[in-house]
Amino acid sequence: MTNVVETIKKQINEVVKNSISKAVQNGELPQFTVDELFIEIPKEKGHGDFSTNIAMQAAKTVRKAPRQVAEIIIKNMDLSNTYIDRVEAAGPGFINFFLTNAWLYDVLKVIQKEKENYGNLDIGRGQKVMVEFVSANPTGPLHMGNARGGALGDCIASVLEKAGYDVTREFYINDAGNQIEKFGISLEARYIQLLKGEDAVEFPEDGYHGEDIIDHMKAYIEENGDNLLYVDSEERRKTLVEYALPKNIERIRKSLENYGVVFDVWFSEQSLYDNGEVRETLDILKEKGYTFEKDGAVWFKASALGAEKDEVIVRNNGIPTYFAADIAYHRNKFLKRKFDRVINLLGADHHGHAARMKCALKAFDIDPDKLDIVIFQLVRLYRNGEIARMSKRTGRAISLDDLLEEVGRDAARFFFNTKASGSHLDFDLDLAVKKSNENPVYYVQYAYARSCSMLRLLESEGFKVPDVDSVDLTVLKAPEEIELMKKLSEYPEEIRISAQTLEPSRLTRYVLDVASNFHSFYNACRVKGEEENLMYARMILVDSTRLVIKNVLDVLSITAPEKM
């Protein structure tokens, strides 16, 4: 797809390198190598449309003041056949490029021709990428950490798809290990209590105390009566887990679907034990000399591969640890299913996980750089200016379902992606339901609805958005028009950086800026009633803004209402 900003950066790169070659040839600069030219969009309007710090980078090598180097480079530039209007040296040695408006008109042409494909990139080149996220314990409802991880992971996956990767969304079901054992004990206790009274058995202090455990057992008793009351405890727990666990998983699936998160694969941890992959993984580690025994347990020699400490992979009771299954799971991802890259999203309590898992990959000759681990921080909910811990509906800890009922899917997904994953997030529940410009998601959706309304009104009077090549766009030169076009031009670059940094929070900030620029344009520039060519040019600008806002909201999986 066409990326006008990328074209301009290539032009600047070519102009600067040719200028340096010319300056070297005529003896103004000594011979030196330019490895990579860093080109950015300045934050200050007066600093031009694009800027580079090449003069400051080269100053030490060429033994001249950065400002002098900048002036020599500028003096030797040939700007013909480029979008560049003029170039200035600024500050300690920045080189600032000011462009003609022609590039902005070309941006509108690209948007009008590519429509929903605007911003699509090919940096992924079809590489197979797995994004594994949420992966909550299937022992209860989804909490706020799962909610943030869900919005973040799904948007990362969408950004990567937009950037040209072949993405698989995966949920790892933790259906083996301690939490399932505890789940079975909790179910058994509630089952017996419901049939024989609360005093019949003590509920485990570290068990799952949620109402859903009681609900499951009431439903089981209604269907099956006391058929398990007098069977062996192990068999009873197994049967109750087999009854309740699929219901919990289905509930999680429905909650996530209501949230706009749909997984391609639901992968069972237990399947790694059932098909022998955990055993095979442990055997290979032993054969390679990466295990040792100590205190009756089997340890992984992670320290031999760069970790700070070794890790237990089989407890002294002979049961593999969660980490052992996780190593097997990552072997499955890379060696059996052959993903080129894997991205795991984990809560802040998994901070030490990245280093040890990368060491485990090294043990199997898998490039550890193929694994990215995104750690996201905690969420605090606020209501009436105070931390909200309980659901207004249930009186229990706020679940994802409670949040969706209170603020809706759009607000939840937008708010969870307003901060970088590594930052703590304060979620204002009152703000999320406000129908005013204070509410960021409302502000963006209103800009989209306004653009649709403007075009709908004009169409009702016989004016349709024309073919972009039939209109003279050079009439678009009001400051608000220029700023809006510049902002629209940045979208492909925002996708590129978001894909490289795995930070979709860039997109919420970006679309807020687009909405702000559009509202400024709306207040300053009339469309209906203007001279015909200007009216049609502005219609193209309105429609291009509509397309970009819709495009971003689609990536964020947030609805774009045509009326509000």
UniProtKB/Swiss-Prot annotation:
Enzyme class (EC, first level): ligase
The organism's place on the tree of life at top rank: Bacteria
Disulfide bonds: none
Entry annotated with the keyword Cytoplasm: yes
Gene Ontology biological process terms in this record: arginyl-tRNA aminoacylation
Motif ('HIGH' region): 136-146
Molecular-function annotations in GO: arginine-tRNA ligase activity; ATP binding
Protein's cellular compartments: Cytoplasm
Subunit and interaction comment: Monomer.
Protein's UniProt name: Arginine--tRNA ligase
Organism: Acetivibrio thermocellus (strain ATCC 27405 / DSM 1237 / JCM 9322 / NBRC 103400 / NCIMB 10682 / NRRL B-4536 / VPI 7372)
